[in-house]
Amino acid sequence: MRDEMNSSSEQSRLKSLAEFRFQMRKFLNFSEIASERCGIPAQQYQLMQVIAAMPEDQQASITYLAERMILRHNSTVELVDRAERAGLVARESDPKDMRRSLVHLTSEGELILNRLVAEHLSELAPRCDHLIRALRELQSAGESQPKP
């Protein structure tokens, strides 16, 4: 009986985790398609989001962008290079430390970002209930998880 309960409980946790992953993948898939429709790779859209979300009194360094994008420093440099060639971002030396580069959106980057943000919010609105339900199920499954 206990094995049946454990397997039922484990099955419920797996189901909750799978549903959450599915809902996230659906949104991420939408994001990739929407970005490509605007002529940019999804990773460049994500880069622009990180830059735009910086606190107003700060500027985006390559190190900060790498951390927020969960990329290696050299991969972030390459991503910024591609976005700069596309006219989405501009890079300048940090006046306080000339070895550091600071990255900001260009006006073209801001236009594309604003359009994509609006599309993403419109897409996300009807999915919120599914995502919230999946998160609540995960939370409940985690709370019922036996402690190791």
Q: What are the roles of these predicted feature ranges?
A:
Residues 1-38, 86-88, 147-148:
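N-terminal leader segment of winged-helix/HTH proteins
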Residues 140-148:
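Short, charged, intrinsically disordered terminal tails
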Residues 81-139:
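Charged, amphipathic alpha-helical coiled-coil/dimerization segments
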Residues 29-72:
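N-terminal helix-turn-helix DNA-binding core of bacterial DNA-binding proteins
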Residues 19, 26, 46-50, 111:
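Pre-recognition alpha-helix immediately N-terminal to the DNA-recognition helix
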Residues 62, 80-81:
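Short, hydrophobic-biased segments on the C-terminal half of alpha helices
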